[in-house]
């Protein structure tokens, strides 16, 4: 695209338009000249694409070129209207317990008010269960009819897709669905409800509200099996698993009491339910040679049956009837496309041939194990439905689906832009000018500028050499670091030494060689070879930082952290996986950046190759430097979201 087709969007000095506690009433749009215009009404649910569309009526996203645009999500937009009218009706036809809970959550005099996006996500799941699935006709004419809902639950095309489809170029074989069917057609499909929620908008509280709704209703009417009395919370790693223990009602630090989720009169009903929090690694099939947690050559139990799997993973929950599943960071929990339907090939993970954000064979294996485990639970114990929570519920390149396509079972959407406009997250700032004299600032598309400036001698295996990247990016790095230093000084002057938690800067690199060079430049920490007793050995040297002394590492203190992605992944696997002491120390440091009194308290800069792992909930990130391509909405939201808490 030419520069004329992609104008730099003008800064919005006051981007917050809405209250976080009410439905958005305004939103920003950009015209073709890149100027922000305030638009009345709520932003329609949509996703951005590069070339191919998978929704209904394609809408041109103003201000960008012909190979980029936005497509609407018709199921979400229609459900928004229906849920709003149901809300205004006083939640007609809901149970008395549900009405009591929804009124409690919506009270304006709450000490900790709940965000509108949290309540709406829960309302949508409740509406689907208590109204549409139960066949209760509301007094208003719904945009999603009961017949539409039944079609969605059978994998059939709902009538409204035909009504909304006005662009002949949209794929006719793609439409919303609320089921996820296994490749083996003899198995029952999973019912899935996807809720897109921006990073920092409170997914854990949404899970707590859904558990409360299910347990209180089931506790009040034991025979009402629409409501589960057992919940499995599936998560991506050990760090998230540890943090989500607050969803267990019996814990002293539970969220139900801390955030006043359950009215006191209903609190005893919570004790009748059971919550299990588990990371997906436990869904991996057990070896036939394992007995009692140990491996034996002479033991061969055969392939693990769904019943044995359920008993191992769920324990006594396996006997408690159909369960509700909450998938946290659910963009990992997808079913790879069948071989005959794949639009892209699977790749191995190497810096040379795998683009950032492209699924590799390990990602595919993780998704297969996660969803395969849910299939086994559904076969044996039964799953009422899954609620998938994610800030980025889109398919990656390499999964066999169109890159960036949304999961088809999304039912609610409150994305990053909505969260910014509602004041829920920090306000990001992008470079919009510099002193180069060029129409576009170099820092705005830094990686693209670096690649364009590279000659053949500056490249190796098709990518810029690390030293060339540092040379080209030094000005941008210095600028961001100067802003970080100013914030660091402000924080240090405003707080006592005991209470001081430093701001953190993130540098996300294209490959390990670039990451290592930037780490050495920022931290001053390098590996050198020395001669000792006639032998050469490596030792660590601590020199000056190329930026500020406040980022310099010393033998007894680490301020700049280089994340070893492989080592961190091993640690996050948790029980049942090989885990070194060093890997566990790294996990604890990364998981507690910005947390006073914790191992990561003093970290000031993080250098990594891949996106930082889920569960990295630091709220002290102030700068992010991206030194690699960010080619999709998913990647931008994932990386930028790390700095907006």
Q: Where do the protein language model's features map onto the residues?
A:
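A short beta-strand element within the Helicase C-terminal
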Residues: 611-629, 637-640
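Interdomain helical connector at the RecA1-RecA2 junction of SF1/SF2 helicase-like NTPases
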Residues: 25, 29, 33-34, 40-41, ...
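Conserved RecA-like ASCE ATPase "motif II neighborhood" in helicase/translocase motors
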Residues: 275-326, 333-376, 584-595, 608-609
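Conserved C-terminal RecA-like helicase domain
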Residues: 99, 112, 136-145, 149, ...
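Conserved pre-motif I regulatory segment
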Residues: 86-196
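Conserved Walker A/P-loop ATP-binding site and its immediately adjacent core
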Residues: 206, 224-255, 281-282, 510-515
């Amino acid at each position: 695209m030419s520069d004329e087709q992609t104008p730099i969007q003008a800064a919005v000095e006051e981007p917050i338009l809405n209250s976080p506690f009410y439905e958005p009433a305004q939103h920003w749009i950009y015209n073709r000249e890149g100027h922000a215009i305030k638009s009345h009404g709520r932003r329609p649910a949509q996703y951005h694409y590069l070339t191919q569309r998978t929704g209904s009526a394609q809408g041109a996203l103003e201000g960008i070129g012909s190979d980029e645009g936005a497509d609407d999500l018709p199921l979400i937009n229609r459900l928004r209207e229906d849920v709003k009218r149901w809300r205004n009706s006083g939640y007609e036809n809901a149970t008395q317990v549900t009405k009591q809970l929804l009124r409690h959550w919506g009270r304006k005099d709450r000490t900790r008010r709940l965000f509108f996006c949290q309540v709406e996500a829960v309302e949508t799941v409740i509406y689907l269960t208590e109204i549409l699935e139960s066949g209760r006709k509301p007094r208003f004419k719904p945009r999603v009819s009961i017949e539409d809902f039944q079609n969605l639950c059978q994998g059939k095309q709902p009538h409204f897709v035909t009504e909304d489809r006005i662009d002949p170029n949209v794929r006719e074989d793609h439409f919303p669905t609320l089921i996820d069917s296994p490749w083996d057609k003899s198995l029952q499909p999973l019912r899935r409800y996807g809720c897109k929620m921006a990073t920092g908008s409170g997914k854990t509280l949404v899970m707590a509200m859904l558990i409360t709704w299910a347990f209180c209703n089931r506790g009040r009417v034991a025979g009402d099996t629409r409501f589960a009395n057992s919940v499995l919370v599936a998560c991506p790693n050990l760090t998230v698993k540890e943090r989500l223990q607050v969803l267990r009602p019996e814990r002293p630090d539970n969220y139900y009491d801390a955030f006043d989720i359950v009215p006191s009169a209903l609190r005893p009903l919570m004790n009748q339910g059971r919550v299990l929090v588990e990371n997906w690694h436990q869904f991996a099939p057990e070896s036939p040679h394992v007995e009692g947690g140990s491996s034996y050559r002479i033991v061969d139990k055969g392939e693990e049956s769904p019943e044995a799997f359920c008993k191992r993973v769920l324990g006594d929950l396996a006997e408690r009837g159909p369960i509700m599943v909450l998938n946290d960071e659910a963009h990992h929990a997808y079913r790879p496309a069948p071989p005959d339907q794949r639009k892209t090939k699977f790749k191995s993970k190497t810096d040379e041939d795998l683009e950032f954000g492209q699924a590799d064979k390990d990602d595919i294996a993780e998704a297969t194990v996660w969803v395969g485990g849910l299939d086994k639970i559904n076969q044996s114990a039964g799953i009422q439905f899954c609620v998938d929570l994610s800030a980025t519920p889109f398919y990656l390149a390499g999964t066999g689906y169109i890159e960036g396509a949304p999961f088809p079972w999304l039912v609610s959407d409150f994305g990053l832009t909505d969260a910014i406009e509602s004041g829920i997250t920090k306000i990001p700032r992008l470079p919009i000018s510099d002193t180069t004299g060029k129409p576009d600032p170099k820092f705005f598309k830094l990686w693209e500028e670096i690649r364009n400036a590279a000659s053949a001698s500056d490249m190796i295996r098709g990518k810029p050499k690390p030293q060339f990247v540092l040379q080209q990016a030094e000005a941008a790095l210095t600028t961001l670091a100067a802003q970080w230093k100013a914030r660091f000084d402000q924080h240090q002057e405003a707080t006592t030494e005991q209470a001081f938690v430093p701001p953190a800067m993130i540098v996300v690199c294209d490959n390990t060689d670039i990451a290592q060079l930037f780490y050495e430049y920022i931290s001053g920490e390098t590996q050198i070879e020395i001669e000792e007793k006639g032998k050469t050995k490596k030792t660590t040297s601590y020199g000056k930082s190329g930026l500020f002394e406040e980022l310099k590492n010393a033998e007894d203190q680490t301020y700049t952290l280089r994340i070893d992605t492989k080592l961190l992944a091993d640690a996050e696997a948790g029980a049942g996986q090989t885990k070194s002491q060093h890997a566990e120390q790294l996990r604890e440091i990364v998981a507690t950046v910005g947390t006073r009194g914790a191992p990561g308290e003093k970290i000031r800069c993080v250098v990594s190759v891949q996106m930082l792992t889920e569960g990295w909930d630091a709220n002290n990130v102030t700068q992010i430097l991206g030194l690699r391509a960010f080619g999709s909405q998913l990647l931008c939201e994932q990386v930028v979201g790390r700095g907006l808490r």
